Design a protein with these regions (language model features):
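N-terminal organellar transit peptides
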Residues: 1-105, 109-198
């Protein structure tokens, strides 16, 4: 393509497709990260590493995260949520479509961090539900092991969301045992977001 030079893909972004990296890099120069996929180990390259670089640079410009995710890996989601909960620079997080499952946990991480402002469009929805983890037979000896592990995962998700939002234990327990779809207006009231965009 004439006039367009492909950038070399840095080793730390090895999980990013080379074509997508061109757009990824251009947005990073504007301190913007678009996350529009399932949560997996790739968040190390696509979210954590850029956020860490921004946190350690000399700029006071806020970082923008555009989030639209169906959720995914519990462990990878908690990796990012725990990091964001104590992030030391300004972040504008914009939910464009939905933040489901572990993406809702990541969203809730900004509830008590004054550096993070979470915005959503009126048509945005958030989904909270019990976590469920698929384990192979080799990873758990018995069904009881799997159930006990899943219960611990559910409890971790529950405690994290309750501690970072206005969601009470009673409300969570009455809603999250099934698929709990939350509108933008309800999310605002529950401190899952800070602002509804027009």
């Amino acid at each position: 393509m004439e006039g367009f030079e492909f950038l070399a893909l840095p080793e730390k972004y090895s999980g990013v497709d080379i074509v997508n990296y061109q757009y990824f890099h251009q947005l990073l120069e504007k301190r913007t990260i678009v996350f529009n996929s399932e949560i997996s180990e790739d968040i190390i390259e696509t979210l954590y590493l850029p956020l860490r670089d921004f946190e350690n640079d000399d700029s006071d410009e806020p970082v923008t995260i555009i989030l639209n995710s169906v959720g995914g890996s519990v462990s990878d989601g908690f990796f990012l949520a725990n990091y964001l909960a104590s992030y030391k620079k300004k972040i504008n997080m914009i939910i464009t479509g939905y933040a489901a499952s572990m993406a809702a946990v990541i969203l809730s991480a900004g509830g008590k961090n004054e550096n993070i402002t979470r915005k959503a469009y009126p048509s945005t929805y958030i989904l909270i539900h019990d976590g469920y983890v698929a384990l192979s037979a080799s990873e758990a000896k018995t069904a009881n092991d799997i159930m006990a592990f899943n219960n611990r995962v559910d409890e971790n998700i529950r405690n994290f969301i309750i501690s970072n939002t206005n969601i009470t234990e009673e409300l969570y327990d009455s809603k999250a045992r099934k698929q709990w779809f939350i509108s933008a207006q309800e999310a605002l009231e529950l401190n899952l977001i800070d602002e509804i965009m027009e």
